[in-house]
Amino acid sequence: LDGLLILVSANQIFDITQKLIPVNIPIFIEKPAGLVPEETKILVKLADKNGSKNMVGYNRRYYSIFHKGIELINQNGGLLGVAVEGHERFWKIVDRDIPNEIRENWIYANSTHTIDLLRLFGGEVEQINALKNSLKEKNGDQFVASMKFVSGTIGTYTSHWFSPGGWTVTLYSDTIAVQFKPLEKGIWIDTDFQQHDIM
């Protein structure tokens, strides 16, 4: 075998991956690698111990539109800030037949798609301040974080699961802003507030 794909429900990924890492065949793991951070840490240690190559499927970071947006920002003074809105439409989720374990850990099961974009655009996080609140969900359903990246860029993350909204990313330089809303569509805004499509 050249590689394995682990494409199972979020609450099964950890157990299956833990059994397959020692086989030492490269593994593509559908996100999340673990349904809670402790599970992910265990898998990292196991992979390091076995020297196995693994990749977690955060496909959105490979959208070509994002890389065009990064290029525009770099051509216009460089990245000063990144703002990610990762609102979930949780009122639609609660009526679906989703195991409680996944629902209670939705921030890891699904929201990490948008959280991952912070590191795609900003790089390694140097400092972070985070708050959470709970309207209905025991592990939180309202999240806000402000951070500074090693590069000096600052960033914010906001997510309100029971408020209408979608996923949005905005990048800031000192002369333009680039916005992805929805994530698959990009525009850039100049200092005259003119909007230009990113092709």
What residue spans do the PLM features occupy?
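A short helix->loop->beta-strand "cap" motif at the edges of active sites that frequently abuts
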Residues: 23-25, 50-53, 153
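Rossmann-fold dehydrogenase core element
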Residues: 42-60, 78-83
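Hydrophobic residues in well-ordered beta-strands that form the structural core
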Residues: 29-30, 54-56, 180
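Short glycine-rich, flexible loops that bind phosphorylated cofactors or substrates
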Residues: 12-13, 91, 164
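Beta-loop-alpha module in the N-terminal Rossmann-like domain of NAD(P)-dependent dehydrogenases
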Residues: 1-46
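A short, glycine/Asx- and small/polar-enriched loop/turn
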Residues: 138-143, 149
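Predominantly a Rossmann-like dinucleotide-binding segment in NAD(P)-dependent oxidoreductases
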Residues: 60-129
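NAD(P)-dinucleotide binding in Rossmann-like oxidoreductases
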Residues: 135, 153-199
